[in-house]
């Protein structure tokens, strides 16, 4: 299979790249800053700037699947107005650019897997939720709604769209745990808030 992947340098994308490479897959990895000198077999790195035409658009033509994991880290910086715009544009504009490239492709991918998050639902306390539950109305919820809306537009071109509403992704020494574990190692850790609030999570292996 020929798979086009965005977000390949992120925590999820880097692991997925390694696992897909072990199968008989040809990978095209899109990045704003492709690593220099990375010429591993079955992998092709291409510079990707949403809204700017380039070789990356032609790579989508004839691909079997597009996996869209790109997005500025949610917890990387304080949510100033500027940072919120970066969070939004890295997700919504990036997805819009991919769908635009799919629309132009002569041979369109059969599948597009696009990231989202459980932030889609907003805070609900103890209420059980599923994929049919209504979205929330805070910043993260509105961001996820707009993000998913752009991905769904690929369906107009006969592409099956799957959305991944993941929780906090946990992995040893990476992501959220990388920031949460050190205080406990220094015996200064403790519960966050009341310690009774819900925190949906998923392990990186899953």
Region spans (language model):
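NAD(P)-dependent short-chain dehydrogenase/reductase
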Residues: 141, 154-157, 162-163, 167-200
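Catalytic helix-loop patch of NAD(P)-dependent Rossmann-fold dehydrogenases
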Residues: 89, 93, 125-163
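NAD(P)H-binding glycine-rich loop region in Rossmannoid oxidoreductase-like domains
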Residues: 43-94
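A conserved structural motif in NAD(P)-dependent oxidoreductases
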Residues: 200-206
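SDR active-site strand-loop-helix element
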Residues: 6, 30, 69-70, 112-118, ...
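N-terminal Rossmann NAD(P)H-binding glycine-rich loop of SDR-like oxidoreductase domains
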Residues: 3-23
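Conserved Rossmann-fold NAD(P)-dependent oxidoreductase catalytic core, especially the SDR/UDP-sugar
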Residues: 84, 96-138
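N-terminal Rossmann-fold cofactor-binding loop
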Residues: 30-34, 49-50
């Amino acid at each position: 299979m020929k798979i086009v992947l965005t977000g390949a340098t992120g925590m999820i994308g880097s692991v997925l790249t390694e696992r897909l490479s072990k199968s008989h897959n040809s990978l095209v990895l899109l990045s704003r800053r492709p690593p220099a000198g990375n010429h591993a077999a079955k992998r092709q790195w291409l510079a990707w700037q949403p809204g700017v035409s380039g070789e990356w658009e032609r790579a989508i033509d004839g691909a079997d699947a597009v996996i869209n994991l790109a997005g500025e880290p949610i917890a990387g910086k304080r949510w100033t107005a500027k940072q919120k715009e970066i969070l939004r544009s890295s997700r919504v504009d990036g997805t819009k650019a991919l769908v635009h490239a799919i629309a132009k492709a002569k041979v369109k991918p059969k599948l597009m897997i696009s990231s989202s998050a459980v932030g889609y639902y907003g805070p609900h306390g103890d209420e059980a939720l599923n994929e049919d539950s209504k979205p929330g109305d805070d910043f993260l919820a509105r961001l996820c709604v707009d993000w998913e809306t752009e991905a769904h537009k690929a369906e107009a071109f006969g592409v099956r769209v799957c959305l991944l509403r993941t929780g906090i992704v946990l992995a040893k020494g990476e992501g959220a745990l990388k920031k949460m574990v050190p205080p406990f190692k220094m015996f200064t850790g403790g519960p966050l808030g009341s310690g009774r609030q819900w925190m949906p999570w998923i392990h990186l292996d899953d």
